[in-house]
Amino acid sequence: LTAFITYLSQVLTALNFLANIFLQGTRAAASNRRLSEVMNTRPDISDDGASRREYRVEKGSIEFRNVSFRYFKNVGAPVLDDVSVKIEPGEFVGIIGSTGSGKSTFVSLIPRLDDPDAGEVLVDGINVKELSLYELRESVAVVLQKNTLFSGTVAENLRWGNEEATDEELEEVCRIAQADSFIRSFPDGYETQIGQGGGNLSGGQKQRLCIARALLKKPKIMILDDSTSAVDTATDAAIRRAFRTQLSHVTKLVIALRISSVMDADKILVLDEGRLAACGTHEELIQSCEAYQEIYYSQKEEGHE
């Protein structure tokens, strides 16, 4: 009887093992189908079958001419509605507006993550639709509020921006992004291991590393979408000063919730329900733009200024 029970137990264990293999195989097949769907999906915007100008962006000027955009064609109000503005090479431009005003959509049209329904977006005076996607996107660096960091060293994560970057270049961009000091405080410095997603770093440290990584691209246009939200105001101000003194040749667009992050911008765009409500310096807008005044004084009362 003991032998029978032992053999039966072994048979049941084997059957259970086979059942698990079958279950895992079924799951793997389903995962493969989903991956295949993603891999075989053609992007809405591509260079396939089109003749593009192999022009490398040199100046970084940006112009929106009567641009309108909807995410769902002919449904609902436009996210951007007849927006026209010109941004000169090297300018520091702040973008302010309430949630849903179209700020992120505005900057997404520059590297052609989306195309406008009407109007034109020009870079260096050329419609972005006429430019090679590769050359256009090589000239634009985008830093989001939440970016991805990978398992590996600090240096390895930074070099995703430029695999050929030297150690000196890494240190230079980290000084601009105000990241060099905290990196050097780690026992292993630039060889410090980062956990998946940057779990062993603070939010502000992750954002500064992502800014440094974007700078390694040596872009002509730099877009920061609320990418210093987790950084204290003193460090935020230091980053802006470094941008002004060391990145005067780069056109900088900064989306910010805190007006203090863009008060010293060359110009500030105020978006309100998809329309460009006003454009000017902080001093001009505080006198003339009701939407800007409302944001400024509400933040001042809350102690953000």
Predicted segment positions?
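Membrane-water interface of transmembrane alpha-helices in multipass transporters/channels
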Residues: 1-6
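Cytosolic ends of transmembrane helices, especially the final helix of ABC transmembrane type-1 domains
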Residues: 10-38
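Amphipathic, soluble alpha-helical interaction motifs
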Residues: 14, 21, 38-41, 265, ...
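An intracellular "coupling" helix at the cytosolic face of ABC transporter transmembrane type-1 domains
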Residues: 24-27, 44, 70-75
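Conserved E/DxxT/N motif and adjacent residues on the DHp alpha2 helix
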Residues: 37, 44, 159
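Short gly/ser/thr-rich secondary-structure transition/capping motifs
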Residues: 44-48, 123-125
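Short, solvent-exposed loop/turn elements at beta->coil junctions and helix N-caps
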Residues: 49-54
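ABC-type nucleotide-binding domain
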Residues: 55-305
